[in-house]
């Protein structure tokens, strides 16, 4: 499988539109536009750094990682020396995350953030991906043209976690003239499919094409250009992140690592859990310091020394 040519658009309209119900456009602190790499590094990142470090900002964000976070999320496309940027400020981030936490009826702005990429998957994953029809458009490569013009080899199939399981002799027909138990896929299946392709190409007889399509395995790779939005991505990432198919894990991890503000918008629940864990650890550390000043630790418990202060009369 493969994911390439990622593009993200619509962030400016989405952030602007999410403030419409509140008539609060003056509170927006995000910036969008085009600039050079020098402009990004020398003007925009310092500007956003000052905004975030002087405000509440994103939970868990520190001075050490703030600059890297702003750059990695804010640059949404690079073209030679120019960058398209979308730097979302803390006010807009706070509102966006509250809307996301409020549910699908409140996070409508996610539907206005558009994403497109080329995705190559085997048929057995496309069948599940096609579940997400609403808000998704796809143009696929023609299976007919691909089969006709290109030789069928092992590389035409998904091999990411391929295990060449032998074809046991006890399951083969007793009158079989050849032994395919060592490598059934390469010795029998793929040569048979390639022979059907060649005979169809030579004769034009559709019976060969029909049999080729009939017996083509589900692991056959097909490329599609996909257009969808953050809401669709939000749904399938939460529904498929623990799926038994490894390909879904690859897709979810790609989204997590490459989409702008994926942690803050799509995986917000995980981000909150991490922040709560850090805050809990910090609280326990501070509590330990306080308790250690009050008493001595004995057998896993703190023993306190109580000193009565008696009022002395003169």
Regions found by a protein language model. Give the residues of each.
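Family-specific signature for flavin-dependent thymidylate synthase
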Residues: 1-314
């Amino acid at each position: 499988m493969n994911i390439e040519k990622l593009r993200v658009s619509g962030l400016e309209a989405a952030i602007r539109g999410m403030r419409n119900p509140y008539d609060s456009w003056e509170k927006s602190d995000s910036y969008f536009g085009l600039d050079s790499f020098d402009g990004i590094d020398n003007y925009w990142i310092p500007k956003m750094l000052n905004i975030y470090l002087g405000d509440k900002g994103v939970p868990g964000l520190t001075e050490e990682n703030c600059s890297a976070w702003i750059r990695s999320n804010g640059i949404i496309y690079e073209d030679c020396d120019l960058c398209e940027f979308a730097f979302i400020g803390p006010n807009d981030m706070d509102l966006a995350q509250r809307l996301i936490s409020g549910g699908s009826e409140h996070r409508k702005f996610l539907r206005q953030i558009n994403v497109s990429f080329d995705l190559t998957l085997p048929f057995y994953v496309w069948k599940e991906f096609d579940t997400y029809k609403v808000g998704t458009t796809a143009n696929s490569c023609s299976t007919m043209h691909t089969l006709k013009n290109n030789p069928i080899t092992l590389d035409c199939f998904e091999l990411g976690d391929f295990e060449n399981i032998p074809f046991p002799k006890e399951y083969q027909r007793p009158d079989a003239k050849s032994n395919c138990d060592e490598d059934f896929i390469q010795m029998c299946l793929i040569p048979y499919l390639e022979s059907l392709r060649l005979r169809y190409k030579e004769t034009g007889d559709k019976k060969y094409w029909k049999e080729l399509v009939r017996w083509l395995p589900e692991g056959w790779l097909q490329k599609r250009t996909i257009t969808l939005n953050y809401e669709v991505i939000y749904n399938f990432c939460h529904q498929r992140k623990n799926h038994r198919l490894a390909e879904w894990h690859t897709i979810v991890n790609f989204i997590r690592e490459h989409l702008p503000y994926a942690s803050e918008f799509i995986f917000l629940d995980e981000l909150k859990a991490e922040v709560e864990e850090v805050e809990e650890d910090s609280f326990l550390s501070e509590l330990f310091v306080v308790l250690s000043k009050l008493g001595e630790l004995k057998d896993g418990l703190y023993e306190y020394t109580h000193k009565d202060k008696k009022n002395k009369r003169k």
